[in-house]
Amino acid sequence: GMYMSGFFPCMMFGIPGAALAMIQTAKTNKRKATIGIVGSAAVCAFLCGVTEPFEFSFMFLAFPLYVVYALLYAIFATVTVALGYRAGFCFSAGLTDAIFSSFLPAANKTLLLIPMGIAAFVVFYLVFLFAIKKFNLKTPGREDDQEGELNIELANDDYTAMAQIILEGLGGKDNI
């Protein structure tokens, strides 16, 4: 559990902090979509410890930010070992494994997860916020607008027009 312990504060608290930074820096016309993508990925990471939806949302758009993200994981892994927090996991470091692993005989100082988690949330949030703004990183919701993208409204009742747009996006009738 010693080397697994560092994942808990990062997955359960750090990722939601980073997600909040991404949501706040998203363009206003893309904020709802960003909340849906990044927010649901953060909930998934917190509850289950499944981080891939969150990581894949930005690792190809802003690779330098992914490097920073990996370094934050390393820092928090070091801190958890130094503080003596011990918790293992069966699947991944989400809430479900945090609850179950806290009852294992090898678990140690399990309540430290709360203050470490709060610290991880704040650190991930501030680092992501700074990096995204300072280096104008293209995280979800900040990517360049495509021509014609702004003309599409999701609440459009003209289903024929929507079907035509979807058909064009799939390569036309001949492609289907």
Where are the model-predicted features located?
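Structural signature of hydrophobic alpha-helical transmembrane segments
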Residues: M4-M12
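Residue-level signature of catalytic and energy-coupling elements of molecular machines
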Residues: G49, N175-I176
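Transmembrane alpha-helical segments and their short flanking loops
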Residues: G1-Y3, I15-Q24, S40-A41, L47-N156
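Structured cytosolic domains appended to multi-pass membrane proteins
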Residues: D157-N175
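Membrane-proximal intracellular helices of multi-pass ion channels
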Residues: T28-I37
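A broadly tuned "polar low-complexity/structure-edge" signature
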Residues: G36-A41, I176
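Short linear motifs at secondary-structure transitions and domain/linker junctions
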Residues: L20, A33-T34, C44-A45, A163-I166
